[in-house]
């Protein structure tokens, strides 16, 4: 390389460097590993909803008894998400990710050997700690290795792994549970993450942006960036992230609640919270609602899986649209359509083909919107507080998941029918739509 180019790389801007390069095989490996993390997160998260009919029959308990168990993992996810963000901003994304995947694999495996509700409740809570920590940190790490032009597309594509994992849980459970019992799905959801944790330990790099911001040394930064463009990285004497000069705060919480970010933070929380009310009410109780309405166990599992599979189909499209149009309006449209299709699902009981189609469309809209939210959050926050900002949105949102699962159990206990439960979902869909559109108006987020 000619000497006149040397000054331009003596102090290399990490994000500008990533933006200027084509996506390398090294970055594709990071995409794949983060996708697998989120896929297994989704598989394990949905497991209780799919094993619930067989579990209640096997243990001779009523479905209301599983309400606390359904919520236990979600409560664990709250603590896992809220605690992992600050840890990742302090100690690194990779360390927290490997520990999280190992944790949810270990306790999912242990859950398969539960003999009563109390044991299962405790083990699902512990599983939830790992599940809650994994997703936000996978989002953060991937976003810090992607160019701005592809950030939303790649992060939402990664997030479709969550929906694909949930969908695969339904398809696999429809085959495994009749043959091997409810334990088999939990065993599968435990063994696979343990294998992945070992792979992550050796093949997943630490975030270069994190290493720069935490002053971990130029050689470490050079080591993790070199596979992208070795010659250019070799010429850099030091590395920097420009936002370091513009965001000053004593701790990560001061960053996400500073005047620049406070309103956007609260609106992100509200949006994601309302979206998860819808997702987890349907994830936890749609198979049971179908069974109560006369569907077979296999039909209930299949239609429940279609809801998750819809998110796989839409996630890439949402990410593509966010990189080209106003991301807040794109996400708002999907939340709005989710409410419309949820209402339509409630009017379609007894028409199996129409019902399955509408469930798929509802899943495309709500899961597509939810998949896009971590990308929106990752683009909104600076490096110093990115893991905390993303993980706290996901953590606070989990209260919506808990509420959704609880509302489903409560409404069924009150005797609400299929149509009434689905119609009620119009309200959280409307609130999510309003909140994300308002964030686009009042915050300093990148509007596309």
Swiss-Prot record:
Query: Which cellular components does GO assign to this protein?
Result: plasma membrane
- How the protein sits in the membrane? Multi-pass membrane protein
Give the Periplasmic membrane side ranges: 52-67, 116-119, 174-184, 283-301, 351, 420-421
The principal localisation class reads membrane
**Keywords for the protein's UniProt record, in alphabetical order:** Cell inner membrane, Cell membrane, Chemotaxis, Membrane, Transmembrane, Transmembrane helix, Transport
Q: Which residues cross the membrane?
A: 31-51, 68-88, 95-115, 120-140, 153-173, 185-205, 262-282, 302-322, 330-350, 352-372, 399-419, 422-442
Q: Which CDD domains match?
A: MFS_PcaK_like
* Compartment annotation: Cell inner membrane
Ranges facing Cytoplasmic side: 1-30, 89-94, 141-152, 206-261, 323-329, 373-398, 443-448
Signal recorded as keyword: no
Describe the function of this protein: Transports 4-hydroxybenzoate (4-HBA) and protocatechuate across the membrane. Driven by the proton motive force. Also functions as a chemoreceptor, which is required for chemotaxis to aromatic acids.
Q: Which family does it belong to?
A: Belongs to the major facilitator superfamily. Aromatic acid:H(+) symporter (AAHS) (TC 2.A.1.15) family.
| The name this protein goes by in its record | 4-hydroxybenzoate transporter PcaK
Which organism's genome codes for this protein?
Answer: Pseudomonas aeruginosa (strain ATCC 15692 / DSM 22644 / CIP 104116 / JCM 14847 / LMG 12228 / 1C / PRS 101 / PAO1)
The lineage is:
Bacteria, Pseudomonadati, Pseudomonadota, Gammaproteobacteria, Pseudomonadales
